[in-house]
UniProtKB/Swiss-Prot annotation:
Gene3D superfamilies: Tetratricopeptide repeat domain. This is Coatomer subunit epsilon-1. Its main location: cytoplasm. It comes from the Eukaryota. It comes from Arabidopsis thaliana (Mouse-ear cress). The keyword Membrane applies.
Length: 292
């Protein structure tokens, strides 16, 4: 992270990235007078934005062997996401780096490790590399991992650490919204207000729209959720969270969800909703065969 002593030249770039304005992050990345450390962080953010947009091959081809270690880690994430059939070798390379005392403690490498192992649903392994924190990105990832482990008590402790560092930080606000959604009940309204605040301060993104829509669904406002999700779909027709949320929302408003599910199958075959749907189909087929 940039030193608090001087101006934070990457503040706007980070904010674009955190809120899902990935193209804006890329378009506004030419920033003058950056230190060498800031240049590496800037390049990592830009390439992570390309990864978020699904441009894996661009990242793989642009980052060569001479690039800084954090950028090599970002390239590894692109390789992991681009070819699931080769993920074992990618994870093996990652483990080698993590075991190397000269680079293994680098914040970006630990962030990428946490992200990959979270994808693998190996949450304990993810936490092994992220739990010590050190950056707001790592603390926020810890919150996500604990929520996936259904340990909102640990997630709350991480959130308190973030609040002590910077209560107004975009990642602190996002982590608070994620936790409120996980806890549910009266906390849903608090999560909605966070996303509403984002939508008033910043250009609307799929991430903000999905956040508001999920809150609406939790509160039973499925028509409003559908409107928000269709707006998100107009911004990015392949966004997996938008498609997954539209599948759920369509079922609640009595509309067919098959088109959205088929789009999700084509663009993100590894998505948890696609796997659950396939499992349900298999179980249904087996049930039918038992009656045949």
């Amino acid at each position: 992270m940039a030193s608090m002593a001087g101006p934070d030249h990457l503040f706007n770039l980070r904010n674009h990235f955190y809120l899902g304005a990935y193209q804006a992050a890329i378009n506004n990345s030419e920033i003058p007078n950056l230190s060498q450390e800031d240049i590496v962080e800037r390049d990592c953010l830009v390439h992570r934005a390309y990864i978020a947009l699904g441009s894996y091959q661009l990242v793989i081809s642009e980052i060569d062997e001479a690039a800084a270690t954090p950028l090599q880690a970002v390239k590894l994430l692109a390789m992991y996401l681009s070819s699931p059939e080769n993920k074992e070798s990618t994870i093996s390379s990652l483990r080698e780096w993590l075991a190397d005392p000269t680079v293994g403690n680098n914040a970006i490498i630990r962030l990428i490790a946490g992200t990959i192992f979270m994808h693998e649903e190996d949450y304990n392994e993810a936490l092994k590399h992220t739990h010590s924190g050190g950056t707001m990105d790592l603390h926020a990832l810890n919150v996500q991992i604990f929520i996936k482990m259904h340990r909102s008590d640990f997630a709350e402790k991480q959130l308190r650490v973030m609040q002590q560092i910077d209560e107004d930080h975009t990642l602190t606000q996002l982590a608070s919204a994620w936790l409120n959604l996980a806890v549910g009940g009266s906390k849903i309204q608090e999560a909605y207000l966070i996303f509403q605040d984002f939508s008033e301060k910043y250009p609307m993104t799929s991430l903000i729209l999905n956040g508001k829509a999920v809150c609406c669904m939790h509160m039973g406002n499925f028509e409003e959720a559908e409107t928000l999700l269709l707006e998100a779909l107009n911004k990015d027709a392949k966004d997996p969270e938008t498609l997954a949320n539209l599948v759920v929302c369509s079922l609640h408003v009595g509309k067919s969800s098959s088109r959205y599910l088929n789009q999700l199958k084509l663009s993100h075959p590894e998505h948890v909703l696609v796997k659950r749907a396939a499992s349900a189909e298999d179980n249904f087929e087996r049930a039918l065969q038992s009656f045949a």
